[in-house]
């Protein structure tokens, strides 16, 4: 083959558009998409793992999971709730009749 024919058979590749000197929009889109995916991954990690890990670590400090308070206020153990019995029932009061009461 002569060089002139081989030049005609090669595919023509378009030249790139001139850059405007700023950040390309494809790069901005790529960063936005990766940030969004990273945020979703962090949220799912918290939802599935970190929340339970926080509860386990708080329970190991001597608190039960019912007493957990996220903040500064601590649980007051000096005044426990008394274990009172329910008042005795007065028998079957019967059906509720409006206006008799």
Curated annotation (Swiss-Prot):
Transmembrane segments: 30-50
Keywords carried by this UniProt record: Host membrane, Membrane, Transmembrane, Transmembrane helix, Transport, Viral movement protein
An example Gene Ontology biological process: transport of virus in host, cell to cell
InterPro entries recorded: Gemini_mov (IPR002621)
Record has Transmembrane helix as a keyword: yes
Subcellular location(s) of the protein: Host membrane
Ranges of biased composition (kind: Polar residues): 80-92
Membrane protein topology class: Single-pass membrane protein
Region (Disordered) location: 1-22, 79-101
Cross-referenced Pfam families: Gemini_mov (PF01708)
GO cellular component terms attached to this protein's record: host cell membrane; membrane
Oligomer and partners: Interacts with the capsid protein (CP). Part of a MP-CP-viral DNA complex.
Protein family (similarity comment): Belongs to the mastrevirus movement protein family.
Functional description taken from the UniProt entry: Involved in the viral transport within, and between cells.
Identification of the protein by name: Movement protein
Annotated organism of origin: Maize streak virus genotype B (isolate Tas)
């Amino acid at each position: 083959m002569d060089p002139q024919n081989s030049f005609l058979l090669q595919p023509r590749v378009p030249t790139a558009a001139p850059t405007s000197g700023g950040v390309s929009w494809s790069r901005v889109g790529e960063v936005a998409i990766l940030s969004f995916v990273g945020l979703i991954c962090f949220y799912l990690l918290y939802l599935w793992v970190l929340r339970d890990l926080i509860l386990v670590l708080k329970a190991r400090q001597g608190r039960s999971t019912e007493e957990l308070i996220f903040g500064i206020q601590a649980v007051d153990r000096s005044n426990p709730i008394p274990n009172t019995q329910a008042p005795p029932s007065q028998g079957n009061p019967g059906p509720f009749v409006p206006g008799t009461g």
